[in-house]
């Protein structure tokens, strides 16, 4: 029996357009899987239309901002897609933020509607006291279901311009307030099509991204490809990361692609009995968002021999992936973040925007249809980011003779000691390879002789038997030039992190009375 294709309200360049097409072509195929349940494409498309109409009935229109404060769930995805279908701008909110921080996102974005998880109701209520512009609230696990059930399922007749904003993704600021990166419909779809073409995804790819909450760009970008290809996005419930539960999910749902940050992969490969599990469904295993040691990458390759190990590099402002390392290159060029993805131009430049010689360190700048339109309401920051017609990443890299890129550090996270530049990532990578080190952060502290001196803050693998400063010093002496050696070592139980999991070097500098005023990576 033929199934009528639902009305497509955009120009083919929105996520909601693609959802409607798949609802017509494969209505009974799973679009979402979550906690043992799911939504077919027909069910998801109808619920998205109903929710879009429910928001419209409450005064939300094209260009209005709809904030979403929710734990991972199918309803969060439905709200994202409903906002897109309506032509509104979706504002994902980090569910780990306190009320004051949530209020800032609501007021800075100018949100008029808020869809909030019932579990986060107290935070939302306090935040709304500081955000009077929010006049519409729907609660996941509460009146949202009533609103969806009461709304019409008739297709919306709204044309959405693909060059208009789809999402405002707030970077997780570690100094000062976060900035909202404005991503258009075109930004996101070009990213999806570039990624799936580059990696060879297929409609039967089932993807789990437990390492990336849905408020994070990696959660959004990780879920869009299967939905736009007619595949299935498998969602893991929010909460503390459980490597055993993650492997259970892969086996149960036959996940083919999965993304985790390095610390999570380290926990996964250490699960007892992992070799006895049926993980044959995995086709691609990816990491990103933080540096991974070469030791961990080799372990991943050995643990999942049937899967392609992929290094994904980028940032929120770029939708987010700009460079990929895959296949045999994961071994041949281990330590690299790869080469530019399809539809991404890169240069490696100095402060005067001159291309640096091959092998020299410079800032990587981008030009791409995937790069954000602007920082929301911040024209000066936008102009600075796009100086010279290229987007300035703030990442310092070098490029080898084959065009492969290697991240050296963040541009503003560098220690200058005795006139020599010490790139923190290089020293951290060496120390992270020590068998007694779980994680490490390098910071600069004031030094009467050299101006700044490197200090390594180390979290040991075994707190009961941490490595000594003498052992760590000997390790570095064998692997680093002398000026790069940490002058001091501080042993701690764990490194402080922001809500997105990035190490808070500002907190470490404050604790150790460091003199550096640099900012932490925002994404």
What spans do the regions from the language model cover?
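Conserved AMP-binding/adenylate-forming core of the ANL superfamily
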Residues: 11, 20, 28-73, 77, ...
């Amino acid at each position: 029996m033929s199934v009528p294709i639902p009305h497509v309200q955009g120009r083919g360049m929105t996520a909601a357009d693609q959802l409607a097409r798949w609802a017509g072509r494969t209505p009974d195929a799973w679009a979402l899987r979550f906690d043992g349940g799911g939504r077919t494409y027909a069910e998801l498309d109808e619920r998205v239309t109903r929710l879009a109409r429910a928001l419209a009935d409450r005064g939300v229109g094209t260009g209005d901002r709809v904030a979403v404060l929710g734990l991972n769930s199918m309803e969060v995805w439905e709200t994202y897609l409903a906002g897109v279908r309506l032509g509104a701008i979706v504002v994902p909110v980090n569910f780990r933020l306190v009320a004051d921080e949530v209020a800032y996102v609501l007021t800075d974005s100018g949100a008029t509607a808020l869809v909030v998880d019932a579990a986060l109701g107290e935070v939302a209520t306090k935040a709304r006291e500081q955000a009077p512009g929010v006049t519409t609230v729907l609660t996941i696990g509460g009146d949202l279901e009533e609103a969806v059930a009461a709304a019409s399922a008739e297709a919306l007749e709204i044309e959405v311009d693909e060059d208009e904003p789809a999402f405002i993704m707030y970077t997780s600021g570690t100094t000062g307030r976060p900035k909202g990166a404005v991503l258009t419909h075109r930004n996101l779809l070009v990213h999806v099509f570039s990624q799936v073409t580059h990696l060879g995804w297929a409609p039967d790819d089932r993807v789990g991204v437990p390492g990336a909450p849905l408020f994070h760009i990696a959660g959004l970008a990780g879920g869009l490809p299967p939905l736009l290809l007619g595949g299935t996005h498998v969602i893991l419930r929010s909460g503390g990361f459980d490597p055993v539960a993650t492997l259970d999910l892969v086996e149960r749902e036959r996940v083919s692609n999965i993304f985790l940050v390095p610390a999570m992969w380290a926990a996964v490969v250490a699960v007892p009995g992992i070799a006895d599990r049926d993980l044959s469904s995995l086709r691609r295993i990816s990491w990103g968002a933080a540096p991974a040691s070469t030791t961990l990458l080799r372990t991943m390759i050995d643990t999942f021999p049937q899967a392609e190990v992929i290094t994904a590099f980028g940032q929120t402002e770029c939708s987010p992936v700009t460079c990929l390392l895959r296949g045999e290159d994961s071994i041949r060029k281990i330590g690299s973040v790869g080469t530019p993805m399809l539809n991404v131009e890169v240069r490696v430049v100095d402060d005067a925007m001159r291309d640096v010689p091959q092998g020299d360190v410079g800032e990587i700048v981008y030009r791409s249809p995937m790069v954000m339109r602007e920082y929301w309401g911040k024209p000066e920051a936008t102009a600075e980011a796009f100086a010279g017609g290229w987007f300035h990443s703030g990442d310092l890299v070098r490029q080898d003779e084959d065009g492969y890129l290697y991240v050296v550090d963040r541009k503003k996270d560098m220690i200058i000691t005795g006139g020599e530049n010490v790139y923190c990532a290089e020293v951290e990578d060496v120390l992270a390879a020590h068998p007694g080190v779980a994680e490490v952060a390098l910071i600069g502290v004031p030094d009467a002789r050299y101006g700044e001196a490197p200090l390594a803050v180390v979290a040991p693998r075994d707190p009961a038997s941490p490595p000594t400063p003498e052992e760590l010093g000997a390790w570095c002496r064998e692997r680093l030039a002398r000026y790069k050696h940490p002058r001091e070592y501080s042993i701690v139980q764990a490194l402080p992190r922001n809500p997105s999991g990035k190490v808070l070097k500002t907190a470490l500098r404050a604790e150790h009375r460091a003199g550096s005023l640099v900012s932490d990576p925002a994404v």
